[in-house]
Amino acid sequence: MKVLSLLPRSRFTESGMTLPETLSLHFLPPNGSHVLIAAAESAQALLLPPSQPYVDAFCLERMPSIRFIRTTGAGFDSVDHLTAAELGIPVSNSPNMNASSVAEYVMAAIVNLQRGLAWADGEIRRGRYAASRAELLEQGGLELRGCRIGLFGLGNIGRAVVPLAKAFGCSVAACDAFWPEEFAAENGVERMDVAELFAECDVVSLHCPLNGSTRNLVDYNLLSSMKPHALLINAARSGVVVEADLARILAEGRIRGAALDCFADDGRAENPFLSIPAERVLLTPHLAGVTRAAFGRMLSQALENLERVLVHGQPPRFVVNGVLADYSD
């Protein structure tokens, strides 16, 4: 059974994965639509990264042999899943496989920004030991204990943050349209609406999908309601935040800082955050969920699901676009 993978073979070898003999994986670097369409000829499935590159309607409509699409992350915005649904192609993701890795990133980012760690390291390497120490002493480092952490989204990743935040002595509030009553009660998570979350929490960490209701949700008005010492952590999707508004808020000193694991400009010169001092903003290249352990779990789950569909003729697990096709021959 031919599976076209837009993940490199190295991802499997680095994770210690042995490719199953029942599947014939063909690895394709991201080379554009026409190359992808040609390579997908006779393939039964696509194995995709969670966010990039994007497989659009143009490609999907020209891949008649594709029966199943599997992403390797909680996100599934690397594919036009609505068009896939119209074509009867199920799209599955990998829920909860990297939740602990992302949660660890969130806590590390908070501590880094509250204490200016990455900035101080850079300043010392530029010969500014005394000056950087004086600046940090004047600004005053913040202690995480006693802070209120606000989670916008209380799914698998948001829930993984809760015990870590509690271990640091923080209280936790959250906003989620699908409120997990039992989990929240058992773990002492306070329910807030989005306006309360941004206005009342010391840290707001985004853990929501990118969809019509969340795109550009975090704008200037919402950001300007945050406390002056507050932090914004975005390890979700760049489109949730109006980046020009966040850059303006940071430049004006309206909040203490932000950690961005995803942003639209991908580090190019026009990225508005590159001109903001590292003391105020931490930029990382979408690696919050990228650990060897997480990749191993995601890839193992993805391969099991591919075998389930293509080899055993069973319906896929973790379908995100509502397509439940019959795979029995």
Segment roles from a protein language model:
Residues 154-155:
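Glycine-rich Rossmann-fold phosphate-binding loop(s) that bind the pyrophosphate
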Residues 1-92, 219:
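An N-terminal-biased, well-structured beta-alpha scaffold segment characteristic
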Residues 36-41, 60-63, 144, 196-201, ...:
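A short, aliphatic-rich alpha-helical micro-motif
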Residues 91, 229-231, 235-329:
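Rossmann-like dinucleotide-binding domain for NAD(H)/NADP(H)
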